[in-house]
From Swiss-Prot:
May interact with Drpr. Its main location: cytoplasm. Disulfide bonds: none annotated. The modification Phosphoserine is found at residues 338, 374, 376, 378, 469. This is PTB domain-containing adapter protein ced-6. Keywords: Cytoplasm, Developmental protein, Phagocytosis, Phosphoprotein. It is found in: Cytoplasm. It comes from Drosophila melanogaster. Residues 1-70, 185-205, 374-393 are annotated as: Disordered. Residues 185-197 have a biased composition (Polar residues).
Amino acid sequence: MPYQPANSGGTSGGSKAAAKMAQLKFWNKQNSSKQQQQDKDKDAADGGNNTSGGGTGSNSNGDAKSEAKNGKRNWLHTPEQLISGHAVYLVKFFGNLSVDQPKGIEVVKEAIRKLQFAQQMKKAETGTQEKFKKLEITISIKGVAIQEPRTHKILHQFPLYNISYCADEKGVKKFFSFIAKTVKTQDGSDPTSNGHANGNGDGSAKVEESHECFVFISNKLASDITLTIGQAFDLAYRKYMDSTEKTNLSKAQQQINHLQQTVNVYKERLREVSAKLPKAELDALLFNLGIKDILEAPTTEPQNGIEVASEALSNGKLDDDKLLIDTNSTTASTHSASPSSFLPIVPPRNNLSSQISIGGKSNSQKMDELLLNSDSDSDFDPRADETQEIGGTGRSAISNMFGFEPANSFGQHLFSNNNDHKLQNNNSSLLITSNNNSINSSGFSSELNITPPLLAPPPKIAAPRRLNSVTTGNGLNGNTDLFGSDPFELNNGPNIFKQNQLNLDDFSLESLDPLRK
């Protein structure tokens, strides 16, 4: 029940008004609490809480991840302020002590507990609360400095690359801390102001590196200080990357200029040396190298296979070294499968053997075959056109009126044996040539499979003069050998003449002429 003044009289109207006011206050308080809860939930969902740590090692990892995922950060200062100037915060220095680890929220909590315990011990000894010293923290992309507000005396100064962790304690909002690397000399002197030892230059003093945790108290700006240090780290990293790219570009340009100067010096020396050589030797050297000038150098620009092929076709010339198909290599199909080369499809290997055996002969082999099949005196046959195939085997029967076959010449013997062997073993030769290994050893198989050239057909084998079966009155067949199987055998011939079965008028001397048909 709200407080009522004494002069109100306790009227009913006053009591009703007081009750309504109390009810309105209760509703306003309840609505305000609901609105605050909704605002907190919204900030947690959006990840835009400005009190989250933005340093190198903030303990609010969830908020930092959500901000990085959204691709934006709620920085407190403009980039120009931290690049050209600095941000200053007034804080209370709680203390500092050495730590074992360079980062971690548990390391920071342990350091805060130790400092609090030390403060309680001093209070118990002296009986009075120690006052904390007020200091200024100056933050920029160059580093973090701790100085006195009035005298601006720098007590501690650390570059950003020496700060390994920065966080504000969420449990206790007023604590802010960071871990930095310090350098001390072995004789126990104070750490240097910039994190590096002030050596004498002789290298006699030994240094010792350690990590210290600095803790500060700020009732309202602890999270802002952490976020400002995080922004300084981000700007410093971007500046470092930009400067590194420019430095690398300048170094590359310097190297290019140095190489150009070196090439010019070498060209001048080469021109002087070539001037001392005889002109004949210089021309021979240029001809062997395929260049017109001694200072000419081949271009090293990469060209794809399509451009090379188009240039070759447009010029109408195709070098032997740039053949599209290499039939002498078994890796032709492998090269043709690569997408970088513009090569046609390789024909099947089973047909390649016949193509090689027919069309792949050298000029020397063709000339030898032409000379072998030429119409010489030994190969001349007046009855070359009288050929008849018997039994479909491709072999011609030769029968002379004297009963024996003349000896074949060297060319007839060669082509007759080759044709018989090829016709009888047609199927087997196709199976053998289908193997890829036989293609590789075609030097020996091609000599065995020699076929007659197209321009000089092989000489035809003479056919018998009398092909019709004629039976004489004496019972003799027209194809019968009148002199027997052997013309020089005396046992066959005289029997015929004794029986008077053959008269001299049956044939004349002109019929015995081998040049007449």
